[in-house]
Amino acid sequence: MAEGSRIPQARALLQQCLHARLQIRPADGDVAAQWVEVQRGLVIYVCFFKGADKELLPKMVNTLLNVKLSETENGKHVSILDLPGNILIIPQATLGGRLKGRNMQYHSNSGKEEGFELYSQFVTLCEKEVAANSKCAEARVVVEHGTYGNRQVLKLDTNGPFTHLIEF
């Protein structure tokens, strides 16, 4: 979590899943909707704030992929890389919202272009980290991701309300 009064540069929400399916493109006329999906693993929702830069990304990826939140069959907590489990990354600008009166405001979020670039680089770093992990390669772990800037439909089966918020 962010220490003291330090302003966070990013926020990530981690949620275990048994199965997750994300619509990345809606149906359009005769063209069917496009979906990505993962089996057992981790859904990572991510939001970047003003002031975030690419130097933050390796720390985020290292922390999120190595935190021991995933439960094995014998009840031991391990990282998603050690499980090994699939990963679905979803851009989630609403994680940057602040309540003002009865409305949510998102003035702290990074701009669209900066957010898109950071999100794209974050996804690439996650893919590289998973590809470099021998357990993940052997288990054919899948890293999927949503589309930055679009509304997306999420279908999620989870093994309990097991959700963690981490600020960077």
From Swiss-Prot:
GO cellular component, one term: cytoplasm
Example GO biological process: tRNA metabolic process
Residue ranges of the motif Gly-transPro motif, allows the protein to recognize chirality of D-amino acids: 160-161
Protein name (Swiss-Prot/TrEMBL): D-aminoacyl-tRNA deacylase 2
InterPro entries xref list: Daa-tRNA_deacyls_DTD, DTD-like_sf
Swiss-Prot/TrEMBL keywords: Cytoplasm, Hydrolase, RNA-binding, tRNA-binding
Pfam family, one: Tyr_Deacylase
